[in-house]
Swiss-Prot record:
PANTHER family: OROTATE PHOSPHORIBOSYLTRANSFERASE, URIDINE 5'-MONOPHOSPHATE SYNTHASE. 5-phospho-alpha-D-ribose 1-diphosphate binds at residues 96, 100, 102, 122-130. The gene is pyrE. It comes from Streptococcus gordonii (strain Challis / ATCC 35105 / BCRC 15272 / CH1 / DL1 / V288). This is Orotate phosphoribosyltransferase. Its EC number is 2.4.2.10.
Amino acid sequence: MTLAKEIARDLLKIKAVYLKPEEPFTWASGIQSPIYTDNRVTLAYPETRTLIEDGFVEKIRAEFPDVEVIAGTATAGIPHGAIIADKMNLPFAYIRSKPKDHGAGNQIEGRVAPGQKMVVIEDLISTGGSVLDAIAAAKREGADVIGAAAIFTYELPKADKNFNDAGVKLVTLSNYTELIHLAEQEGYINAEGLALLKRFKEDQENWHL
């Protein structure tokens, strides 16, 4: 079984991902969605957590061999990023969504040298907006951001466009396509549910029952 399928299986098993194609969720953006993901749940399961962090290390070493510092997005990317940095014996920093309004006004916590090659860790990619904002902040501080890595992606076309426009390489451990097919194979959804989930991937903005 591939890493993407292993992680998809674990996300379903521990209920980090909920699939309700016939009772959709409403995202903050207003989009009706048949899927909801909370990857923070993975931190409570040591075997899943280890699978994820080892997967990150393998992917980062393969795709970004020159990395010099790992950074996590606040807050979801912090625990994963810290574990990855420890496993890779690299410095760690984290990036706030906005600068502090007191003290030194830092947006990046930790020490990042100008030109230091950075990979930014996020737990979930929807449109990619939050991680790309974090990357922009890191670049303003002088970091050389060579890529981003995430546990899971919804594979939204808008995310692909946003990362391409920003010139940022993204790698993920698992994805929507792998997960919905595995979910159907293992009985989480039926064939009709799978068809609804496939339709969502084709046109998220206009998807409805």
